[in-house]
Structure formats: C-alpha cells, structure tokens
Amino acid sequence: MSGNSANGDSKRIAPVKFAHAVLRTNKFRQMVDWYKTVLQADVVFENQMLAFMTYDDEHHRIAIAAFPGIEDRAPRGAGLDHLAYTYRNFSDLIATYERLKAAGITPVAPINHGLTLSMYYRDPDGNKVELQIDNFDTVEELKGFFRSNDFSKNPIGVTFDPDELARQYHAGVPEAELRKYRPENGLDPNFFHKMAQ
C-alpha cells in the first residue's frame, strides 16, 4: 500500500487535494461575476440559484449558491476567514493585480507574510480572497521560515504598496529584491480592523 500523506506515514489516509469551496449568497449575480473576473474562471454550469466555476483541470473549484432565506454575512462573525489562491510566479501576480485594478477591484490589504507575497480582496459579500505567490522556491524553505526569528516576532507580516511594487517590477528591479521580507517596514496599524470586517 502506498501512503499519500505529506509526512510519508503510510497508515494515515489523507485527502489528495482540496477540491472546491461553495459560497452561499443573496447577491448571486454580483458574486458570480466577481469570481469570474478575479479568478478568470469559466462557468461550467449555471441556473438561477447555482453556478459552478473552474480555472484549471478540476470540474469545479468554486460554486456560488443562492438558496432562499440567506441573510447578509455578519461582520466580525466566526467562520472561515479567507480563501487563498497561489499564482505561478511574480509576473502573473502583478499582471492579475493590474488587470483587477483596471476593473475597479483593488486589494484591501497587501501583505508580505515572509512566506508569501499576498494581496487580500473582498468579494461582494465581504468574504476575503487572498491572491499570493510563495516567497521561497521549496517547501523546505517555506517550512523553515516558520521556525525563523522573523516569523516568531511577527507572524502576520508587513504591508506594502502594490502600485509601487508594480512600478519597481516594470522598472526592472529583480524579483528576489521585490519579494524580500523586510520586517523593519512594519504592519499597517489598521490591518486588523480591515481584516476583521
């Protein structure tokens, strides 16, 4: 029997992948359009209350459901904090940022977590969506950052200006320099307020 666990334990049976997320909404059309725009997703099925979308070889990665009686999302309520999507490279993340900005969709919190360079957005229901790239080339390096002094001192990260990041990228500043974690830059004092809403 071959094991499929991340740590090589052949007795543990773990999922092979995260398949999809389903979001309930009372803003069906806005939500479908937003996720189609943000993820450049294709709709594989849609009727008046359900839409199934994908952006890769999976049959669907996200579904939007408008079941009767759904109320607005409670601000600061318990539950899922955000969904995160990883891009192939720095160039794709910057191109996505610029495409979304041109469509009037801007991040509420751009953060360099050290592990990842991330931009958090809010969908029409207020759910957070993180678009990110890894700041390291290997899983071992990423796991190593969890054990670093930088991470233990600040496990959230530091804010950055995405317009300035894009400007520097187009000016030819090396990607490694742009992804570099700079703990001295600090965290936006309003970060937790922005993220908790």
What are these regions (language model features)?
Residues H20, H59-I62, H82, H113:
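Histidine-centered active-site/metal-ligand motif
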Residues P15, R76-L80:
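Short, low-complexity disordered segments enriched in Ser/Pro/Gly and basic
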Residues D42-G77, R122, K128-F136:
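Conserved short beta-strand elements that form part of the metal-binding/catalytic scaffold
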Residues S2, V16, L23-R29, A84-K128, ...:
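Vicinal oxygen chelate
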Residues S2-D56:
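N-terminal "first-domain core" detector
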Residues V32-E46, I64-E71, V173-Y181:
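Charged, low-complexity, helix/coiled-coil-prone segments
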Residues L50, E71, L83, P107-V108:
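Short secondary-structure capping micro-motifs at structural edges
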